[in-house]
Regions:
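C-terminal catalytic/acceptor-binding lobe
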Residues: 143-145, 153, 158-217
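Active-site nucleotide-sugar/metal-binding loop of Leloir-type enzymes
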Residues: 41-54
């Protein structure tokens, strides 16, 4: 397996930079300050023109550890889409909901409401973890809001990223819709929990800083 960690970086978040400095043993592609549609398409094209086998998505408002990255990398290659989970920042209290839903996003995604997703609660997964064996901690889901994710090359080849203007997390919502339609199942390991930061949209530097791609081998 040869994974590429793709870091979507439209902001400048010190806590994220401090965390990512500690991540080693994996190639990194930084997509900095591009509009969302350009960012995902440029990353996809770079990946498809390379010999990397897996596309790993990391947004810059998610704090991950080396253990998180290693765990996601080391899953069996039979998983076309697998991720951890994180807290959801859609409420003032960011420690109630997860980023996981058992329901598909609406189409188009911009018509979604927060309540409409019926997010799993953090407490639900904590309770489940206390009762299941490790082998039962990996569950199929219809939507997860971009915790650290690993996507196979065949998935990236078949599923294009698309955006739906007006939706704050449109690329992940649209990607979930397309994965489902093409026939891919996505899985979440509920043992791997990451910290999702609540960052105001005013912190976006798209259009304010020069858009660049940086590769670190």
């Amino acid at each position: 397996m040869k994974p590429l960690l793709v870091i979507f970086n439209p902001r400048s978040i010190p806590e994220f930079y401090k965390a990512i400095e500690k991540i080693n043993g994996i190639s990194k592609l930084w997509i900095k300050y591009f509009p969302q549609d350009e960012a995902y398409n440029k990353a996809r094209l770079f990946f498809l023109q390379s010999d990397y086998t897996h596309f790993m998505i990391l947004p810059d408002d998610l704090i991950v550890t080396q253990a998180d990255v290693d765990a996601i990398v080391n899953y069996d290659e039979s998983y076309d889409s697998i991720s951890g989970l994180c807290n959801n920042t859609g409420r003032d209290d960011t420690n109630i909901d997860t980023n996981i839903s058992a329901f598909l996003p609406p189409d188009p995604p911009r018509t979604a409401t927060y309540e409409g997703y019926r997010w799993f609660k953090i407490a639900q997964f904590e309770s489940l973890l206390s009762k299941v064996e490790n082998s039962d901690a990996i569950i199929p889901v219809l939507h997860q809001g971009f915790a650290l994710s690993r996507l196979s090359r065949r998935l990236i080849e078949q599923v294009r990223f698309r955006t739906d203007a007006g939706c704050c997390v449109d690329s992940c919502l649209s990607l979930d819709l397309m994965k489902f339609r093409v026939g891919f199942t996505q899985y979440v390991d509920i043992r791997i929990r990451m910290k999702h930061l609540k960052i105001p949209r005013s912190e976006l530097l798209v259009g304010k800083e020069k858009a660049i791609m940086l590769f670190e081998n």
